[in-house]
Every structure is written in C-alpha cells, then in structure tokens.
From Swiss-Prot:
Gene Ontology MF term list: rRNA binding; structural constituent of ribosome
Cited Gene3D superfamilies: Ribosomal protein L22/L17
Role description: This protein binds specifically to 23S rRNA; its binding is stimulated by other ribosomal proteins, e.g. L4, L17, and L20. It is important during the early stages of 50S assembly. It makes multiple contacts with different domains of the 23S rRNA in the assembled 50S subunit and ribosome. The globular domain of the protein is located near the polypeptide exit tunnel on the outside of the subunit, while an extended beta-hairpin is found that lines the wall of the exit tunnel in the center of the 70S ribosome.
Assembly mode: Part of the 50S ribosomal subunit.
Keywords: Ribonucleoprotein, Ribosomal protein, RNA-binding, rRNA-binding
CDD domains: Ribosomal_L22 (cd00336)
GO cellular component, one term: cytosolic large ribosomal subunit
Protein name: Large ribosomal subunit protein uL22
Originating species: Leuconostoc citreum (strain KM20)
Pfam families recorded: Ribosomal_L22
Domain of life the protein comes from: Bacteria
Gene that encodes it: rplV
Family: Belongs to the universal ribosomal protein uL22 family.
Length: 118
C-alpha cells in the first residue's frame, strides 16, 4: 500500500536577503503552527519577513492542493535558509583603490507537515 503523504515543501531561490538575517526570522517560526507563524511574521519588523511569508504561503497551498491536507492541522516542520550566489560589487575608495561589497542571496525552504496525533 502507498504511504500517506503528510508534508509539503516550498522553496524560493536567489532571494535578495542575507542568509544570516533570514535565519533570525526562520528560527522564530520553526515548530509553530501555521496560523501562529502567520501572526508572528505579520508583526516582526525584519525585511526578510515578506519573502518568508510568501514561501510559507506557497508551502501551505502545496499541502492543501497537492496532498489535500487541512490548513488548521499544519505545523512548520522545517525552515532553513541556505546561501545563494553572491553579487559582487565594488565601492571606490581613497587613492584610486576599491573595496569589495558582497550582496548576499538566500535559498529559503519551508516544509509544513501535519501535527502528529498524541
């Protein structure tokens, strides 16, 4: 028999947010219910919350449409940000020199799963 699928995932690639800053937000929503995660993201001041909100929304939509899971029973099982390609820029400095500026990007992944029955 086929095993029932109880989780769904969504990924956003090359998001223009430093992974370190995205992880600060992802750490706060990990292992929370989806509704609680939405509430947390709505009121956090970090700029990365908009991108993370979109990925969470996509993961929930994947769970509902692809696997017929109920939104009320979902929790954020995994949430992580890996480093994407770095955009390298240069700032002119004194005496004709230049300093590098690294504009970092992230790959944000969120996995939602059904709550385990106790």
């Amino acid at each position: 028999m086929a095993e029932q699928i109880t989780s769904a995932r969504a990924t956003a690639k090359i998001v223009r947010v430093a992974p370190r800053k995205a992880r600060l937000v992802l750490d706060t929503i990990r292992r929370k219910s989806v509704n609680e995660a939405y509430a947390i993201l709505k009121f956090l001041p970090n700029t990365s919350t908009e991108d993370i909100y979109k990925v969470l929304n996509s993961a929930v939509a994947n769970a509902e449409n692809n696997f017929s899971l109920d939104r009320e029973d979902l929790i954020v099982k995994e949430a992580f940000a890996n480093e994407g390609p770095t955009l390298k820029r240069f700032r002119p400095r004194a005496k004709g020199s230049a300093s590098p500026i690294n504009k970092r990007t992230s790959h944000i992944t969120i996995v939602v799963a059904e709550k385990e029955a106790k």
